[in-house]
């Protein structure tokens, strides 16, 4: 298992502008995602991410380059996995259940908590609205790969609510 060094942003919290968080994450180490999670889908886009935390939240920024992008789902807890998306999983030491955060390229979120995909319960839409995000899509060069970034700030208070 790879260990990540996660920086503490002492100047940032859930009230910090997401654009400022995005800028700060640009100076952090980029971690490459280089494994295809499903055998039957062998397409591997170029994906990196940066991670840090503040006094009351965790910050993530994804940097993605791929052939095509799709963003059809705009409501919370809809099938963003059918769109161009990224995921983040977190489990706390004393629990069997984990959180699964899925974000499409425009920031629509699907968030669940459970011990497996089959028994996951979805977070309430009002809780999801506490997560700040910024999406940037740059597809101004026809015929070339599409590039997008997504920055999110996930409040620690969400992890205290086990649906």
Named regions from a protein language model:
Residues 1-161:
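Structural preference for beta-rich elements and adjacent junctions enriched in aromatics
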């Amino acid at each position: 298992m790879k260990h990540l060094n996660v920086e503490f942003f002492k100047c940032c919290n859930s009230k910090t502008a997401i654009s400022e968080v995005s800028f700060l994450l640009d100076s952090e180490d980029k971690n490459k995602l280089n494994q295809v999670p499903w055998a039957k889908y062998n397409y591997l886009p170029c994906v990196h991410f940066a991670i840090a935390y503040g006094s009351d939240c965790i910050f993530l920024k994804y940097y993605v380059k791929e052939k095509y992008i799709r963003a059809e789902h705009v409501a919370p807890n809809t099938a963003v996995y059918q769109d161009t998306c990224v995921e983040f999983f977190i489990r706390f030491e004393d629990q069997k259940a984990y959180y699964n955060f899925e974000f499409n390229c425009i920031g629509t979120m699907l968030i669940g908590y459970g011990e497996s995909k089959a028994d996951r319960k979805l977070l309430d839409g009002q809780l999801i609205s506490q997560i700040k995000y910024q999406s940037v899509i740059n597809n101004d060069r026809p015929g070339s790969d599409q590039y997008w970034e997504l920055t999110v700030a996930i409040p620690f208070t969400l992890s205290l609510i086990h649906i």
